[in-house]
Design a protein with these regions (language model features):
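Mg2+-dependent prenyl diphosphate-binding active-site environment of isoprenoid biosynthetic enzymes
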Residues: 1-185
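Conserved small/polar residues in nucleotide/adenosyl-binding loops
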Residues: 189-193
Length: 193
């Protein structure tokens, strides 16, 4: 179980390092990002190094199903990040597309962690699917809360610049719900982008 947990943590950290480069984030959790301390190229290589280490740890589980799920999760997360980047400042996004996007990013990692834990621990098959769904729902909830905090908390509370999602053109659930309640204001939001 420990190699799986280490692989998930390394994968998560690698994605955060890459996210900070993409977002040009100066800090995370109140501390300078790797890109701020070094440079973008070194940060990308550090993230890649962590991806490779994560793959090494997941391989130590010796479970081909867990290894395949891990590889699929990496692909799904990369696709989610690409989708988010390609839809920046696209204010026509709807709530379902938002849910699809966060399912492909945060929720897929939580789902793989929960499912992989069940598999590696030898849980009966009837529990594996429910554990995956639990992880996915937990990941969705985590991302929604994170998006709400980006919209409502201060930079000091977040440890990073508040409102960074909106500034980078990432349309999150709070923005979608606001635009849904105030359709007349949608033209104003479109002009922001």
């Amino acid at each position: 179980l420990v190699p799986l947990a280490a692989s998930v943590e390394l994968l998560h950290t690698a994605t955060l390092i890459h996210d900070d480069v993409i977002d040009a984030a100066p800090e995370r959790r109140g501390r300078p990002t790797a890109a701020a301390l070094f440079n973008n190229a070194s940060s990308v290589m550090l993230g890649d190094y962590m991806f490779a280490h994560a793959a090494e740890f997941v391989a130590r589980t010796g479970n081909i199903r867990v290894i395949r799920n891990f590889a699929d999760t990496l692909r799904v997360m990369a696709n989610g990040e690409l989708t988010q980047d390609m839809s920046a400042f696209e204010y026509s996004e709807d709530v379902q597309r938002y849910f699809d996007r966060i399912a492909g990013k945060t929720a897929s990692l939580f789902a793989t962690a929960a499912e992989g834990g069940a598999i590696v621990c030898g849980a009966p098959e009837r529990y594996v699917g429910p554990m995956r769904r639990y992880g996915e729902q937990l990941g969705m909830a985590f991302q929604i809360v994170d998006d709400i905090l980006d919209f409502s908390a201060t930079s000091e509370e977040l440890g990073k610049p508040a409102g960074s999602d909106l500034l980078s053109g990432t349309v999150t659930l709070p923005a979608l719900l606001y635009m849904g309640r105030s359709p007349a204001d949608r033209s104003e939001e479109r002009r922001v982008g």
